[in-house]
């Protein structure tokens, strides 16, 4: 659905966005260390594919550690293999989180005597994947890159302290269409950049992945028009309501109580 209607971007604007995000990424990482590695989860979706391409331009493939993390079985793992091969990501690992996830599910059922709600089964794999990325970062030394985009954040298609975690986020303020355009500009295969967005957890009757837009009932293009132009479309109220409900995911700084008088006390 998304690919049928795209916002209009000039070639010059996309070149500028691509150059800016590459330079920003290079500066951020190199400021910490000119030899710093970056760990990225490679799902085969457009976001991780485009961020990997940005990293390649910014710091080179030798400093990228790509990690595939299927949960037992991943229907579209061929796409993540394609990303690794196409970008020449020489440092890559495939760590299956399936056994850890199902063991954890078993422990929760045993101790709580409860069936696990969708909020558990949807978000726990994402949090295990982030734990895996930080594990790799601890072993080899490196930063973990966040690959979330603004459009999917708005509708809640990211997990707090799961895929929405990380040490820096190159595309978090870019819409899906801007991510696609940058991926095209950087020369990624059309099948990767224009892949139907899907969370990988829901299937169609034929066993293929069910797209996000089918489940949402509206397109990311409509979301993007609201983000960039505040256009009052058919699903405007619904999308804005989702945006408000998911705003807490954008603000990763935890709300904290700040005592007002302690400094005065210790100054006495």
Q: PLM ranges: what are they?
A:
Residues 1-40, 53-57, 62-65, 71-73, ...:
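ATP/NTP-dependent adenylation/nucleotidyl-transfer catalytic domains that generate, transfer
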Residues 76:
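Conserved Walker A/P-loop ATP-binding site and its immediately adjacent core
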Residues 45:
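Conserved G/P- and acidic residue-centered "switch" motifs that form tight phosphate/ATP-binding loops
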Residues 49-50:
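Phosphate-binding Walker
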Residues 79:
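Catalytic core regions of nucleotide second-messenger enzymes
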């Amino acid at each position: 659905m998304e690919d049928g209607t795209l916002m209009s971007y000039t070639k010059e604007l996309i070149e500028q966005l691509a150059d800016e995000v590459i330079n920003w990424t290079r500066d951020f990482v190199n400021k910490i260390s000119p030899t710093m590695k970056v760990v990225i989860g490679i799902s085969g979706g457009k976001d991780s594919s485009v961020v990997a391409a940005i990293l390649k331009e910014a710091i080179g493939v030798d400093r990228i550690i790509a990690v595939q993390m299927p949960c037992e079985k991943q229907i579209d793992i061929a796409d993540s293999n394609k990303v690794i091969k196409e970008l020449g990501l020489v440092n890559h690992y495939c760590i299956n989180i399936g056994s850890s996830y199902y063991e954890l599910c078993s422990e929760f059922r045993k101790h709580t005597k409860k069936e696990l709600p969708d909020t558990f089964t949807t978000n726990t794999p994402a949090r295990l994947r982030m734990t895996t990325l930080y594990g790799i970062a601890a072993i080899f030394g490196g930063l973990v890159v966040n690959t979330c985009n603004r459009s999917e954040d708005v509708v809640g298609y990211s997990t707090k302290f799961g895929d929405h975690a990380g040490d820096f986020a190159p595309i978090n303020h870019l819409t899906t269409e801007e991510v696609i355009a940058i991926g095209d500009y950087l020369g990624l295969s059309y099948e990767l950049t224009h892949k139907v967005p899907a969370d990988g957890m829901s299937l169609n009757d034929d066993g293929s992945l069910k797209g996000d837009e089918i489940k949402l009932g509206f397109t990311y293009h409509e979301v993007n028009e609201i983000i960039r132009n505040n256009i009052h479309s058919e699903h405007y109220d619904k999308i804005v309501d989702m945006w408000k409900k998911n705003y807490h995911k954008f603000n990763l700084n935890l709300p904290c109580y700040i005592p007002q008088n302690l400094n005065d006390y210790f100054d006495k």
